[in-house]
A protein has these predicted regions:
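Sequence-structural signature of mature extracellular/luminal beta-sheet repeat domains
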Residues: 1-354
Length: 354
């Protein structure tokens, strides 16, 4: 989960701390098992379940796609007194730099490959092994006589509901035309213009939403955060929209865990008040809410009184990753130095043989 406090510092539950800067600096704030996790990061993040890798997107200029991987031991160094580490510690493994205009938001595994929503290009991109990004899907509405328009953010194509293939996936956007004001501009009229695109047809399959985010397949249904009205909705293949739950805040961030869906809410940024016609800004809270998938009942909430924005939520099994490099409450410089000096990933081979 990614959140931002009123002072502008970002806090992330269950992920490492990342400060996004033009140089792409990466550092960490850890958690201790059994304690409330709190740390920080940029916007989208995604777990690659087959390998246990965590991918985190920073949307600063340049964009940076970080890869983090669990370390389960120390290298057999003769200059160390410590012989091991406790648990599976999430450590930095790589970074990929992309133009700031890519404007990465959501990340998702579609089939075996990592994909991202390149909001600045009105497209979905894949990330080839050799670096960079490659456009692999875009809605037909950006195509004209001169080809597809990847040069301006026309749609705010920000969310991915990942299926087994692009054709089986769905994507959210704030509108489906290239006319008039664009998302991000204050004069952009938002109410009822949001859509869900079908990956198969590249056309809207659902209309009437307001600044939708975080589409996810929950059980056998497609759930979407209808942010401008502070709700979570279930969208049918026939274009129908059913309200599942109403919450006190700008809904964004959605993750299913067992029989619950965890939904994030954020405060309204004052200059974007017009983007939330269905909300009362003074009543909005920054928090996480557990929604019963069958009934839509909110069974529990965790609210940060000084919080501001939540961007994304991802569940990471503790058997894959059970702690982070640093304990924010009890720092241990010697152990931290040893960990960064000689950590070993579970997939590492000490000797390469021909």
């Amino acid at each position: 989960m990614v959140a931002e406090s009123r002072r502008g510092r970002r806090h992330l539950a269950g992920q490492p701390r990342i400060r996004a800067s033009p140089a792409g600096a990466l550092d960490g704030l850890g958690i201790t098992p059994g304690e409330l996790p709190q740390a920080a990061a940029p916007v989208g993040h995604c777990l690659r379940r087959g390998t246990g890798e965590v991918h985190v997107a920073s949307t600063r200029n340049p964009n940076v796609l970080y890869t983090l991987r669990a370390a389960d031991g120390l290298l057999p160094r003769r200059d160390l007194t410590s012989k091991g580490i406790a648990g599976n510690v999430l450590m930095p493994a790589g970074a990929r730099f992309l133009p700031g205009s890519t404007y990465l938001h959501d990340l998702a595994m579609i089939g075996p490959e990592l994909h991202g929503s390149a909001v600045g290009e009105n497209a979905i991109v894949a990330f080839p092994a050799l670096g960079g990004s490659q456009r692999v899907w875009w809605p037909s509405c950006i195509e004209g006589d001169a080809g597809a328009d990847f040069g301006l953010n026309h749609l705010q194509l920000n969310g991915i509901a990942a299926g087994k293939s692009l054709a089986e996936s769905c994507f959210t956007a704030s509108k489906d035309d290239l006319v008039g004001a664009r998302p991000g501009q204050i004069e952009f009229a938002v109410e009822g213009r949001g859509v869900i695109f079908s990956g198969a047809t590249r056309l809207p399959m659902t209309r009437g939403l307001t600044r939708p985010h975080s589409p996810r397949f929950v059980s056998d249904a497609l759930w979407v955060a209808n942010s401008g009205f502070g709700s979570v909705v279930s969208c049918g293949q026939d274009g129908s929209v059913e309200i599942v739950a109403r919450l006190r805040g700008w809904t964004r961030g959605l993750c299913a865990i067992g029989n619950l869906a965890i939904v994030g809410t954020s405060r309204i940024i004052p200059r974007f008040r017009a983007y939330a016609p269905g909300l009362e800004p003074d009543r909005c809270v920054c928090g996480l809410h557990a929604v019963d998938i069958k009934s839509g009942r909110v069974v529990a909430s965790l609210v940060w009184p000084a919080g501001n924005q939540i961007f994304a939520i991802e569940a990471v099994p503790s058997r894959m990753i059970d702690r982070l490099p640093f304990d924010g409450f009890r720092r241990m410089p010697g152990a931290e130095q040893t960990l960064f000096y000689a950590w070993q990933a579970g997939s590492r081979n000490d000797v390469r043989r021909n």
